Structure formats: C-alpha cells, structure tokens
C-alpha cells in the first residue's frame, strides 16, 4: 500500500504485453498467471485453509476474516473486504465488484501487496501498484463499467483501467479505519509465518485510531471539519503513502502471506517489543508512528527503557545517569501541552515561564503561522532519533547524519538532519537542544539560539519549543510540507520525557550485560563501604572514642 506505478515507455510496453480480444481474457490471463507465483506447497496450504478446491469458487468470508484476525473488528473488516473485492478484479477496476471473494481473487491480493510477487505478476517495468488509489474506486466502477471497453493491457496498467484519480475522494472514516489497522500490524505481525496475537492492540484500538488521525491530519487539511462530507483526495493520500508511510507495506504483506500457511504451520515468535506499554508515552501505536517516520535505512528491532521523567525525576542529572551509559542509538520521546497564551500563563499560572520567555527569542506575531490543526489541538508529542551515544556537550555538539526529529501529535511530520553535530546536552544551564546552536550562558543569564527547524528544552525539563522557519539549518523540511518556508513555533509545558535504547539483539545483549555489571559493581562497592565503616567504628570503640554514649571527638 503506497507505491505508485512508474511511467514506462509506451512502445516497449506494448510489445511486452500479450494481446487480448476481450476483457474477460485479461482476467483469465492474470488468474492463470497468479497461481504460478506460488509454490505447490503454498497453493495446497491455501486451498486446505480456505476449503478452496476450485479457486474460481467464492471463499467463506468468515474464514478470511479469521485468517486476517478481523473477526472481532466488523467495521475494519468491512473496509478491508471491500478493498479485497475490488483488487480481485485486477487490473480491471471498472469491472462490477462481486459480493464474494474467490480463491483467485485472494491470491491476486497477496501478490499485489508483495513487491517481488507483483513484479513477476505484471512482468513489466511498472514496479509497483498503488493500492490506496483503489480505496475510492468502488463508487465509480459500476457507473463506468459499460463505458470502458479497452483491452490494451499496457494502457490499463498505467491508468488504473482509465480511472481519473484526480476526481477520487476517499471517505475520512474509511481511511482512519484502514490506517489504524495497518498501524496495529507493525507490532503484531513481525514475519510471514509467525503466530499473531492482536488481542492487546484490539483492546487499545482507540490509541491506534488516534495515531491514524494524526496521520490523516497531515495528509490533508480537509481532515479537519467536513472531511466526512467531501472525503480526502486520493492524490493527497497517494503522496503521503509514497513519502511517510511506505514502511507500512511490508507489515501488510507479512499478514497476507500468512494465508499461505496452515494454522498448525505458524510458528511461535518472541515479541521483541513486549516491553512497550500503553501506560508509557511511547505506546505501541506511537512506536508504529516512529517506524514510519524513520528513514528506510534505520531499523529498530528492540527497545530498552532507559529513562522516564515521571519515574526518575525531571532533571538533567537524572537523565544523564540513566542514559549516558548506553553506547548505541536512542529514541527520545517528549510530550506536553501547547501554551496558547504566553502572557496569561506566565502571569497567572507559572512565573518561571516568564524567565524562559526572556531567555528564548520568540517569533514575531507576523511570523507565527500555526495551521488550523495546531490551533485547535493542545497535546503535542515529539520524537528524536539520536544516532550517537549521548555526551556532555557544553561547547561542541554531537550527532551524525541519521538524526531525525518527528512530530507524532497532532500531526505526523519527519525532519531529517542534513549535517553532523546537531544536538547538545548542556549541563551549565543550557538544557537540551536538537537543531539549535549552543545557548549563551553567562552567570545566571541564558540566551537560547534556536535553529530553523529545532526542538529545545530548558535545563529543568519544564518547557519546550519546536520551531520551524523553513530550510537552511541542520534539518530538512518535512516531505509533506506544501509550503516549506512557512514559519511557526509551538511552545509547550513538558509533561513527560522518555529515552529508549535502540539496537538489534547483539547491541542490546552487550549493553544489558554492561549495565548489569555496573549495577552489580555499584552494589559490591556499597557492601565494601558498609563493611569498612563497620570496621572503623569497631576500632574507634576499642580506643574509647565512640560508643558508651560518646559521640566522638578529636585526639
């Protein structure tokens, strides 16, 4: 879901495709071709699982629903099944949509979602199909089915069977359901043949729905207000999936590949993300947002909780003691509430904020161009992927070129670094900054120097500011920004800060071994100190300097 068809050369394509006299011949051609993409074992397991001796015959919806773990989510199943029934007509989207799903149809869906299988299915320079486009086609298909007579396969593939994509609007509610469902797969479907347990994600469905809303808020401004009336343009969704949500495709493919295994053939899989809790800021749903926000070159397979402000205390020293021993990449999550009226908040609620305002240069009112989403939402959440170990940096900064700032609520935005050394951890009063210059600290006077795109936190971890004044700093603008020169800043009260250690099995094993050794060493030294103290006290008692109601003294 999310990649578009490329634009191949017409002459080459027309020669590479077989010729057809009728559209029924095209459907039969792909039905025959799709079976050849699977092994004999896979087809046998598929037929057994769905009682599909004849692949032309309809499959019981209940069996498909159970296989996709959607039996407890009727609304999601309705949206997913509608998409499957449309895709089974591939590539003829103007064909009437059937009321049932056939064996051939379901196999085609499995192949379309899988990159390698799809390349073999179409056998052209078109490398991928955008399934998001099909979500809004259902209303057009019956209307146009008698008008489209084309049998030119090259044209059909390039134009989605001559569909006018620009005119398609996808219902907002359907988009939210499908995106929320896809997000649940990130933490629940790790491989193509693992046993899946989605009961926890279903129980916390509203969290995934909230994450889906953040993504919808980014896709189109029409997501706010009357989106249910007019829908969201398919072109906007296509652009979003091609940029920020391409990482969801493998997880959906993993799930549909499950249909090629018998239930007894699925294997146990250790959930490497079982330590994520719906009580933390980094919930499973926010983790899914982080995954789709990171560059494809970055993978996070395991996480280790290092620091939680609400548990360990909001201080630079506490964060340093918990995080600095981790010698691998980390993920910092910052959540808070936007301050809508600086003067009112500083005067009536928190006088310390007045000092922060003095230290942090505000944008001029004319430059404050917050969009409708941010003006109507109070909660904000940011994530920062830190690709180097933390260190005290009162003069120099640290960080390599994979540093990434992500906004997770109320929108999904990603800002990737374009240079090295973009972060500081200033222990002399400057706090934490990503994308900013080192603050000027003179005695009790602090002056922050925010970058064009930057996230800044004061030394008490009480206030934060995300600033965006366009390109030109250490971070690139978001891929989905229609106007990347737009300036705004979001000032907020920090409610929680979390830092998680990232890495694969090898990195995590080494880090955990080191942490366990350090904790054991600290306890050993504590024992030695207590023993030494006991011995010293006994010696003093022997010479009569302490004990017997004496408190000690000089000799």
Curated annotation (Swiss-Prot):
Q: What does this protein do?
A: May be involved in a process influencing telomere capping.
Which domain of life does this protein belong to? Eukaryota
Where is it localised? Cytoplasm
Supply the name of the protein.
Restriction of telomere capping protein 5
Where is the major localization of this protein? cytoplasm
For this UniProt record, give its keywords in alphabetical order, as a comma-separated list.
Answer: Cytoplasm
Q: Which organism is it from?
A: Candida glabrata (strain ATCC 2001 / BCRC 20586 / JCM 3761 / NBRC 0622 / NRRL Y-65 / CBS 138)
Q: Which GO terms describe its cellular component?
A: fungal-type vacuole membrane
Gene encoding this polypeptide?
A: RTC5
BP terms from Gene Ontology:
protein-containing complex disassembly
